[in-house]
Amino acid sequence: MAKFIRNLADKAPSMVAAAVTYSKPRLATFWHYARVELVPPTLGEIPTAIQSMKSIIHSAQTGNFKHLTVKEAVLNGLVATEVWMWFYIGEIIGKRGIVGYDV
């Protein structure tokens, strides 16, 4: 066991350096898209979002959603699932734990 720990301690700096080298470009890409995609909506985008919600409610009331193509229905389902999961992530962060959720 001591040999394993000594061997691991000898290899740790090179393993950490390799991990840092591997993750630097990926982290830069992540931060680029995070800055673009995770910004709050501007005041000009809010009326567009409200109009979009009104059209969704109207299509649900009139039954127009039955005329969606399969591709549109799948995309709408994926977006709804993403919003639902972000809600759960926010709840988990707010409670500071997964306990109490059927995850």
UniProtKB/Swiss-Prot annotation:
GO-annotated molecular function: proton transmembrane transporter activity
Residue positions where N6-acetyllysine is found in the record: 11, 24, 54
Modified residues (N-acetylalanine): 2
GO BP, sorted A to Z: proton motive force-driven ATP synthesis; proton motive force-driven mitochondrial ATP synthesis
Subunit structure: Component of the ATP synthase complex composed at least of ATP5F1A/subunit alpha, ATP5F1B/subunit beta, ATP5MC1/subunit c (homooctomer), MT-ATP6/subunit a, MT-ATP8/subunit 8, ATP5ME/subunit e, ATP5MF/subunit f, ATP5MG/subunit g, ATP5MK/subunit k, ATP5MJ/subunit j, ATP5F1C/subunit gamma, ATP5F1D/subunit delta, ATP5F1E/subunit epsilon, ATP5PF/subunit F6, ATP5PB/subunit b, ATP5PD/subunit d, ATP5PO/subunit OSCP.
Function in brief: Subunit g, of the mitochondrial membrane ATP synthase complex (F(1)F(0) ATP synthase or Complex V) that produces ATP from ADP in the presence of a proton gradient across the membrane which is generated by electron transport complexes of the respiratory chain. ATP synthase complex consist of a soluble F(1) head domain - the catalytic core - and a membrane F(1) domain - the membrane proton channel. These two domains are linked by a central stalk rotating inside the F(1) region and a stationary peripheral stalk.
Family named by the database record: Belongs to the ATPase g subunit family.
Protein's UniProt name: ATP synthase F(0) complex subunit g, mitochondrial
Organism: Rattus norvegicus
Lineage of producing organism: Eukaryota, Metazoa, Chordata, Craniata, Vertebrata
Name of the coding gene: Atp5mg
